[in-house]
């Protein structure tokens, strides 16, 4: 069985521009320095069956929130743009929702976006 969270994470880590950025799932590591940028991948629910045939699920639908945090606003936006292009290349597109804000408590800018996508037919997710 494949795991879409791992697929997304691996795709992001392969990119030369993102390979030195901390990429984690669910939450930003507390041990990361305040000024370091990070990417956090959060599933917004379990995979949903979408294509069915012969009483079987043939494809799954996934929804993820990708949070990019950085000390500089434009750095966070540039990282999020690279994330967007990589996700498009694997069949995910931006959906409604998200956040663009500066948090005084952490002194970081956050650009959080929601992405949706489907597995290919017959892939085992």
Features from the language model and the residues they span:
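Oligomerization/assembly interface segments of phage tail-like spikes and tubes
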Residues: 58-71, 108-120
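Small/polar-rich, solvent-exposed N-terminal microdomains that initiate assembly or binding
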Residues: 1-52
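Amphipathic alpha-helical segments
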Residues: 5-16, 80-92
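Acidic-leaning, charged glycine-interspersed low-complexity segments
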Residues: 81-125
